[in-house]
Amino acid sequence: MPSLRTRREEAEMELSAPGPSPWTPAAQARVSDAPAVTHPGSAACGTPCCSDTELEAICPHYQQPDCDTRTEDKEFLHKEDIHEDLESQAEISENYAGDVFQVPKLGDLCDDVSERDWGVPEGRRLPQSLSQEGDFTPAAMGLLRGPLGEKDLDCNGFDSRFSLSPNLMACQEIPXXERPHPYDMGGQSFQHSVDLTGHEGVPTAESPLICNECGKTFRGNPDLIQRQIVHTGEASFMCDDCGKTFSQNSVLKNRHRSHMSEKAYQCSECGKAFRGHSDFSRHQSHHSSERPYTCTECGKAFSQNSSLKKHQKSHMSEKPYECNECGKAFRRSSNLIQHQRIHSGEKPYVCSECGKAFRRSSNLIKHHRTHTGEKPFECGECGKAFSQSAHLRKHQRVHTGEKPYECNDCGKPFSRVSNLIKHHRVHTGEKPYKCSDCGKXFSQSSSLIQHRRIHTGEKPHVCNVCGKAFSYSSVLRKHQIIHTGEKPYRCSVCGKAFSHSSALIQHQGVHTGDKPYACHECGKTFGRSSNLILHQRVHTGEKPYECTECGKTFSQSSTLIQHQRIHNGLKPHECNQCGKAFNRSSNLIHHQKVHTGEKPYTCVECGKGFSQSSHLIQHQIIHTGERPYKCSECGKAFSQRSVLIQHQRIHTGVKPYDCAACGKAFSQRSKLIKHQLIHTRE
């Protein structure tokens, strides 16, 4: 491919050759009407390129005898040649107010010179939408600056050399009326507000630039362009390491940091290391109770400046933008525009994939990532990627330990505002989620969803081993341990292992004697909250579990299940030694001790062993002389409940034990057994 210098030489030859002039008619007319002037290099080219006025306007060094500034390899000055610094454009005089040039399209600069031919890196090339426009804004041209330095570009149709800068111009005209930013101090005009800002040295607030998409205002044209790229979804900044593209240069810089393996910032307290200084500073604030950021309005202190800024917004009363529908006021006009779409129902941003519409362009961009699978926000610590920046910020708190949301009642901090809202209901007792079937209320929506499965019978969580279904995922996880036999939770005192953490916690109460759950009626304490709930039904008399066969009610669901086996004759618990079956697992456990001879329950008074704890309790009454079971009819007391029940049959006359041979009834089972011996002798 011919070099750019070869093309420039060819262009100079073509410019001197006969044929149609490459100058625009308006430019030719302006030059022909103005008095010709000579300049350094005019003898070499033989062309009076501009008038005295124009030359002075374009080059501030003109008529300065001590200045011999020239650009690289430039023998003479054309009106297209300008210096790259912003001061040259800022010093255009009012005598040249009618001649402001428009930046050409890339294709107009040179038909056969592409961005690649110019040496523009792929990561800095312009988006397609910008490269097809007629004007290059300063921000757009800024994409082309940097590695190119001071390279001159030649156009085949002109003897013009262009430097890649915001001041690149072509021989095209823009009327003076289209320059919206006059400068009162010197009468100078600029095509872009950012040029005026650079001239004044102070950002202008009187003439802000407004985004047509969202109504947000900007002080500079580059900020506006960057905002518009967010709406279009174009990604113009490419990462050299992984090839991923981004719409903002700041995001690209963050991406570069994620590729860096070095974690330069290490905490002296805990040794944790961070790549970014902001994450490091945020983390350090959690080691100390220092809160250096104080609100001047109410005196409340914060450990982070960002938390203070969020808090200060609550004191801001000025909201000049008011909705004429509902009267709600906003601090920003863009927020009002977005709010008004709630009343109008307008959803101007439509997904081209599924047709779903959104009120905000940002929501459309987020939604579109569900189709593309794009996750542009990556954690610099662990590399995990997210589709939304908010999700990344929440995730980063896992690494930093930051908990910026603090409960005003108890001071407990949380990493997420949603968790703070849920926690606050503990103090208020609020239960906003109500079941439409039974009226029961819940503090969390997830609890309501799980509760409703009682009414619907839905069991969405299925075991992939045996196919058994469950209403709750937690119950499924517990069930799956049956198949694996895993017992990952081990007691540090006795070494006993458990399949569930809750079972380990309950077991540890045996060693500590801790019984934190107390009944407010009688003061009895329990090691498990579930046992307290069951106990409280003794006081309330509540029996919520009813048998559908006989109507009998029970205080515990397990008792109902055991009772129902009487009706269906089911005895699922079978002894593997003798084959005897039982309707309760507890009865099987007791029975198996007959085969093993195990008597784990020993009396501390006499050393006698028992296979069941209930037998030990009954035995201990012998030593204490306690008789807690008293007859309500005659006042007689007994050491065992079973003996009291037998005694009460004297008063009631109940004889539940019938002889199958003769039909005679007895109040005690032992008497029936003795009676049956009469029939066996016969």
From Swiss-Prot:
Purpose of the protein: Acts as a transcriptional activator. Promotes cell proliferation by facilitating the cell cycle phase transition from the S to G2/M phase. Involved in both the hemin- and phorbol myristate acetate (PMA)-induced erythroid and megakaryocytic differentiation, respectively. Also plays a role as an inhibitor of cell apoptosis.
InterPro entries, per database record: C2H2-ZF_Transcription_Reg, Znf_C2H2_sf, Znf_C2H2_type
Organism of origin: Pan troglodytes
Location relative to the cell: Nucleus
Entry GO CC: nucleus
Positions of region (Disordered): 1-38
Keywords: Acetylation, Activator, Cell cycle, Cell division, DNA-binding, Isopeptide bond, Metal-binding, Mitogen, Nucleus, Repeat, Transcription, Transcription regulation, Ubl conjugation, Zinc, Zinc-finger
Biased composition (Basic and acidic residues): 1-10
Protein's UniProt keywords contain GTP-binding: no
Family: Belongs to the krueppel C2H2-type zinc-finger protein family.
Name of protein: Zinc finger protein 16
Main location group: nucleus
Single GO term (MF): RNA polymerase II cis-regulatory region sequence-specific DNA binding
Annotated segments matching region Required for nuclear localization: 268-393, 341-373, 473-503
Segments passing through the bilayer: none
Zn-finger segments (C2H2-type): 209-231, 237-259, 265-287, 293-315, 321-343, 349-371, 377-399, 405-427, 433-455, 461-483, 489-511, 517-539, 545-567, 573-595, 601-623, 629-651, 657-679
Cross-link type Glycyl lysine isopeptide (Lys-Gly) (interchain with G-Cter in SUMO2), residue numbers: K253
PANTHER family attached to this UniProt entry: ODD-SKIPPED - RELATED (PTHR14196), ZINC FINGER PROTEIN 208-LIKE (PTHR14196:SF12)
